[in-house]
Each structure stands twice: as structure tokens, then as C-alpha cells.
Amino acid sequence: MTKDIAQVMAEVGRKAKAAAAPLSIATSEQKNKALNAAADAILEARADILEANRLDLANAEKNGMAASFVDRLTLNEARIDAIAEDIRAIATLPDPVGEVIAEWDRPNGLHIERVRTPLGVIGVIYESRPNVTADAGALCLKAGNAVILRGGSDSAHSSAAIHKALVKGLEAANLPADAIQIVPVTDRAAVGEMLKGLGGAIDVIVPRGGKSLVARVQSEARVPVFAHLEGICHLYIDKSADLDMARRIALDAKMRRTGICGAAETLLVDRAVASTHLAPILGDLAAGGCEIRGSAEVLALYPAAKPATEEDWSTEYLDAIISVALVDGISGAIDHINRYSSHHTEAIVAEDAQTVARFFNEIDSAILLHNASTQFADGGEFGMGAEIGIATGKMHARGPVGVEQLTSFKYRVRGSGQVRG
């Protein structure tokens, strides 16, 4: 790490801290004006953004990056339209800042209110997905937070072009341009500086990316982190489940999009209905192109499966692969999930109310679903608008991190001359 990088990042932190103060008291109208103007600017800069993206794609091709990586990096007309639409959607969300969460009166006449406030300065560290530049910038702005964006170097040109449009939005609403900054250097030492907190400037870090990035952030950060390391999500089929429903949900939970953190990675089936339910469900998955890895009991009932190893139960595949085991009812499912889960998302298919109640009460994961696909683990599906990520920690934010989760709170206490005496 060079002294220059430390100095550059310290200046970024100072600017963000200075911008956070006026942004925290900006009106809803100002913030929405900035967001809509940013969406307009992105559409107006379409040609520039596509040209910048072509430079990033050329570098990716030269470096032999995988097809899935190139797809995440690629922007086109439709994706730029979607970025602008997402920003406009964030503008339509209720402004959380200033919301009175709770209020009560004390016997001495004091009136107490708990009120939402911005967090301050948020650092977002992400890999080469240019749309995150827009999503994170817009969400933080809506919640009244300044943000420092550090995207992957592979998307540097694309992110810079999008950032330019976001700044135009801020300027159109007379908000500080430094409220949304992009790290001006690609040196990885800049990430290390952010994880130290930039001298107290950063209030929280949000990593968006693969396991290695998130693990580094969680181990090195000296400020709070909103993140999940893995999405080892389970789907349990109870003996009381409707088979047709179970088949639909299992296929969607695994195969709708295999590479997202809400995709099911392990299927658990109640041993009591294995003889009737297992083969149809696994047949659907196999027909959809999914590789089945099963326990010895599963192999006996479904010989087309491959043997599962101990490692499979704690693996996030992010691919068309699923591990399958039989369990002794809800108790067995709870034991397995609490042992192997990453505490992201779990789902149960069941009709018995007591079984569902145990699932909800005894499993400690951020998102629990009944008779619905794990792929609903998404801020947009929760009605939160876009999300900046999903958190599995227990402090402050848990589950989808949307605008509301990017706030803290303070207490306002109104009196009429009371003294404690």
C-alpha cells in the first residue's frame, strides 16, 4: 500500500462525511428529484455508457474471463433501460427518514418518539456488475446516506460512466456531488483503506460479490458489515405436503435461477413420504437439467442420483446441482438445517399448521418461507424496491437490505419544563 492511496482514500472519506450532513436533512422532494434526474441522465448518456462498457468487455475478453462473468459485466440497450427504471422505482418508495417508528407518553408528561435517521456514510464494495453502481448509489441516496462505491476494476469504465450520470442527478437537485463517490483508483489497497473506516468516515460496509470478497470484508473490516457469506438454502418437503405443490416449488427453488443466493442447494424429504414423493420431485429436477446428489437412502429409491459426500451438505453450488437427504419429519429437518445452514433462507412445503409453526420458531435463518419458493428471498419480491444485498447477521439489518434497513434511529423527547430532581 502506498502513501498516495491512503491519502486519496482519506480525501474521499472527508468529502463523503461533509456531504452526509446536508444530505441527511434533504427533503423527500429533493432526493426524488435527484433520482429521477439521474435516471434521465443515464438514458441521455446511453451511447457513452455503452462505449465505456465495450472497453470493459474488450479487456475481459483479452483476460479470458468466463462467459458468466462477461454476462454480468455486459450492458445493452435493455439493461440500461432497466437501470433507469430501477432508479425511478426507488424514487417512488416511501422516504424512511423522519418516520416515527414508535411513540409513547410517560407518567411525568414526557412524550418520546423513536425516529428513523440516515446511517451516515456507507461503503459499498462489489465485483464487476455495473448495475450495482446505480442500485447502491440510488438506495443510499433515498435513505439520506452518502456512499463510497468501489466496484471491480474489470467494470471501471462502465461504473465511471454510470456514476457521472448519478452526479448529474445530485447537481440537478442542488445536493452535494460528493454524496455519491466512486473510488478513483483501481489499486486493491483502496479496499483495505475502506475496511479500516477511512478515519471514522465510514459507518457501515456492504460487500456485494463472491465468497472470497465477502470473507475478506468480514475478517478485515473495522466497521460494521451488512453481508452474507453464502446462501446454503434448504427446502423441506413434509409428510403433510401437497405433492403437486411440492413439485412446482422444488423445481422453481432450484432451477429458476441457479446462480443466485436464494437458490435451494439442499432438498430434505420426510422419510414418511419418500416412497411416493421423492421420485416425482427428483424426476422433475433431472428433466430440468439438474444433477442430483443423494444420501444412501436416496440412491436406493432414486438410482440415477450420484452419491453425496459430507461436503455437499455445506456447499453453495450456484449451479444446477442439488444435494438430497431423507429426514425423520420436522425434527430431523430442523436438526439438519440448523447444523448445515448459512442462515440465509429456508422453505417448508406442508399443510400441517403445528409443523409449520415449529419450522418458523425453531430455525434461526434470516428468511423462512411456507409453501413458497426460496427464490422469493429478494428485496423486490418483499415490496422493498431494490436491495443493496441480503444480510444474515443478527445486528441491525437482517434479510433483504433495502432503503429502510439503511437507516438508524434517534429519540426525540418533548417536555414542558420537567426536571428529574
Swiss-Prot record:
<keyword id="KW-0560">Oxidoreductase</keyword>
<dbReference type="GO" id="GO:0055129">
    <property type="term" value="P:L-proline biosynthetic process"/>
</dbReference>
<comment type="pathway">
    <text>Amino-acid biosynthesis; L-proline biosynthesis; L-glutamate 5-semialdehyde from L-glutamate: step 2/2.</text>
</comment>
<comment type="function">
    <text>Catalyzes the NADPH-dependent reduction of L-glutamate 5-phosphate into L-glutamate 5-semialdehyde and phosphate. The product spontaneously undergoes cyclization to form 1-pyrroline-5-carboxylate.</text>
</comment>
<dbReference type="InterPro" id="IPR016161">
    <property type="entry name" value="Ald_DH/histidinol_DH"/>
</dbReference>
<dbReference type="Pfam" id="PF00171">
    <property type="entry name" value="Aldedh"/>
</dbReference>
<dbReference type="InterPro" id="IPR016162">
    <property type="entry name" value="Ald_DH_N"/>
</dbReference>
<dbReference type="InterPro" id="IPR015590">
    <property type="entry name" value="Aldehyde_DH_dom"/>
</dbReference>
<keyword id="KW-0641">Proline biosynthesis</keyword>
<dbReference type="InterPro" id="IPR012134">
    <property type="entry name" value="Glu-5-SA_DH"/>
</dbReference>
<dbReference type="GO" id="GO:0050661">
    <property type="term" value="F:NADP binding"/>
</dbReference>
<dbReference type="GO" id="GO:0005737">
    <property type="term" value="C:cytoplasm"/>
</dbReference>
<protein>
    <recommendedName>
        <fullName>Gamma-glutamyl phosphate reductase</fullName>
        <ecNumber>1.2.1.41</ecNumber>
    </recommendedName>
</protein>
<comment type="similarity">
    <text>Belongs to the gamma-glutamyl phosphate reductase family.</text>
</comment>
<dbReference type="InterPro" id="IPR016163">
    <property type="entry name" value="Ald_DH_C"/>
</dbReference>
<keyword id="KW-0028">Amino-acid biosynthesis</keyword>
<dbReference type="InterPro" id="IPR000965">
    <property type="entry name" value="GPR_dom"/>
</dbReference>
<dbReference type="GO" id="GO:0004350">
    <property type="term" value="F:glutamate-5-semialdehyde dehydrogenase activity"/>
</dbReference>
<keyword id="KW-0521">NADP</keyword>
<keyword id="KW-0963">Cytoplasm</keyword>
<dbReference type="InterPro" id="IPR020593">
    <property type="entry name" value="G-glutamylP_reductase_CS"/>
</dbReference>
